């Protein structure tokens, strides 16, 4: 199987990273077992969820313009950026009806995942920061590096329990 091809049937897809050298993001295709239970059935309403991580970035305004052109909504998992342009992007995401999700304030794995206390501090900072700017009480979180990352010094179950206790849904 070459880069960019998708498997069919009950084959197992392996991790492949797709990186656009001119972009500030990458897509990792994780292990996915495909079987009949996760395939669309005739008559199903098909859905696609668009999510964007690590923003706002230099591409966010263009992404929002394109989404508006096609009347499409997306979820933006953002990090804490204090510059005026980023603050305007947070507001624009919300004002245009998209979902604003948290992706940590600092995005510094070595700090966030060092302890539950550090994770809680970073989480509280991004949640309060986004609320102060947008008035939105964010309830969605995407772990930097994913919920099964290899850099955490703390059992990820502790972080997940904390998010559950905060009524926050996490997504990978």
Give names to the regions the model predicted.
Residues 8-26, 30:
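Low-complexity, acidic Ser/Thr/Pro-rich repeat tracts that form intrinsically disordered stalk/linker regions
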Residues 119-123, 153-160:
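Charged helix-capping and loop-helix junction motifs
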Residues 156-172:
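His/Asp/Glu-enriched short active-site or ligand-binding loop at hydrolase and phosphoryl-transfer sites
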């Amino acid at each position: 199987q070459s880069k960019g091809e998708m498997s069919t049937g009950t084959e197992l897809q392996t991790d492949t990273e797709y990186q656009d050298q001119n972009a500030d993001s990458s897509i990792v295709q994780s292990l996915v077992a495909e079987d009949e239970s996760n395939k669309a059935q005739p008559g199903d309403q098909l859905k696609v969820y668009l999510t964007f991580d690590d923003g706002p970035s230099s591409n966010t305004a263009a992404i929002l313009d394109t989404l508006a052109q096609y009347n499409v909504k997306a979820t933006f998992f953002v990090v804490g950026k204090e510059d005026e342009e980023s603050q305007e992007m947070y507001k624009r995401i919300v004002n245009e009806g998209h979902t604003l999700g948290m992706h940590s304030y600092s995005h510094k794995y070595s700090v966030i995942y060092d302890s539950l206390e550090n994770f809680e501090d970073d989480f509280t900072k991004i949640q309060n920061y986004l609320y102060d700017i947008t008035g939105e009480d964010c309830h969605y979180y995407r772990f930097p590096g994913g919920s099964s990352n290899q850099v955490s010094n703390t059992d990820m179950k502790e972080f997940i329990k904390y998010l559950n206790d905060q009524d926050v849904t996490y997504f990978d």
